[in-house]
Design a protein with these regions (language model features):
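ABC ATPase nucleotide-binding domain "signature motif"
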Residues: 2-8
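Hydrophobic anchor residue at the start of the ABC signature
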Residues: 11
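Conserved signature/switch motifs of ABC ATPase nucleotide-binding domains
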Residues: 17
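Catalytic Walker B motif of ABC-type/P-loop ATPase nucleotide-binding domains
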Residues: 22-25
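Helical segment within the ABC ATPase nucleotide-binding domain
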Residues: 36-50
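Conserved H-loop
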Residues: 51-57
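Conserved catalytic segment of ABC-fold P-loop ATPases
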Residues: 66-73
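Conserved beta-strand-loop-alpha-helix hinge in the C-terminal portion
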Residues: 76-106
Length: 119
């Protein structure tokens, strides 16, 4: 199976049991960018149909902003939450919109990778 097909199979295996909470730990981390974006849309479609709670762990800031309604930003050493950001945008989201870029920059600033600090 291709990476995308393997991820689809893993997602179906998770959903077949109809869990109350959908737990996704880096589900798209091993995919190329285009397959990853397609899978993000597939997961969002499933999520919108099932209307179930989903918790997703990702290291991709764009993925968190694109898919999340709430983003908990963590720092390491020790692992702690440094920001709780609500993404107040409707789905589907435009990755090139000004608000998307603002959310991404806010997260980068919280991780000290941006040009200015966010308090």
């Amino acid at each position: 199976l291709s990476g995308g097909m393997a991820q689809r199979v893993a997602l179906v295996r998770t959903l077949i049991n109809e869990p109350e909470i959908l737990l996704l730990d880096e589900p798209l981390g091993a995919l190329d960018e285009f397959t990853r974006m397609n899978m993000q849309d597939e997961i969002l479609n499933i999520w919108s149909q099932k209307k179930q709670l989903a918790l997703m762990v990702t290291h991709s800031i764009d993925e968190a902003v694109y898919m999340g309604t709430r983003v908990l930003v963590m720092e390491s050493n020790p692992g702690r939450i440094v920001a709780d950001i609500r993404i107040d945008e409707d789905f589907p989201r435009d990755r090139s919109s000004a608000s998307f870029v603002e959310y991404r920059n806010e997260i980068l600033n919280r991780l000290h990778f941006g040009g200015k600090k966010t308090e």
